[in-house]
């Protein structure tokens, strides 16, 4: 599905890797709305100049993107129908919650959300 989002050619492979991870997580633990939101966030990050996703580990970006989507949608609120702990999310991507939160904060600042 990656090519339809008009990703810069130099970032297509990175985008595909990151969204492959976010897609898998959303399929296993969340839903299609989260999957689509994560994809849109990844597209926006690809279009930043310079794009921050050009460097760093893909699983770090994937974790940060899902964490950010979760923060703005109250995923970590146990009173919501769809919820989970930040620890669970970060563990899936093999990160501690502080790392996930830090990356999420950076992403939210870059995308001016939350």
Regions found by a protein language model. Name each.
Residues 1-58, 70-114:
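Basic, alpha-helical nucleic-acid-binding regions used in initiation and control of genome expression
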Residues 61-68:
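Short, structured motif recognition centered on aromatic/hydrophobic residues
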């Amino acid at each position: 599905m990656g090519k339809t989002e008009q990703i810069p050619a130099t970032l297509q492979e990175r985008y595909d890797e990151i969204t492959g991870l976010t897609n898998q997580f959303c399929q296993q633990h969340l839903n299609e709305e989260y999957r689509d939101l994560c994809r849109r966030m990844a597209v926006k990050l690809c279009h930043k100049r310079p794009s921050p996703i050009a460097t760093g580990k893909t699983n770090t970006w994937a974790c940060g993107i899902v964490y950010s989507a979760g923060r703005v949608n109250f995923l970590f609120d146990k009173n919501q129908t769809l919820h989970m702990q930040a620890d669970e999310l970060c563990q899936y991507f093999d990160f501690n919650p502080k790392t996930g939160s830090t990356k999420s904060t950076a992403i939210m600042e870059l995308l001016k959300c939350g």
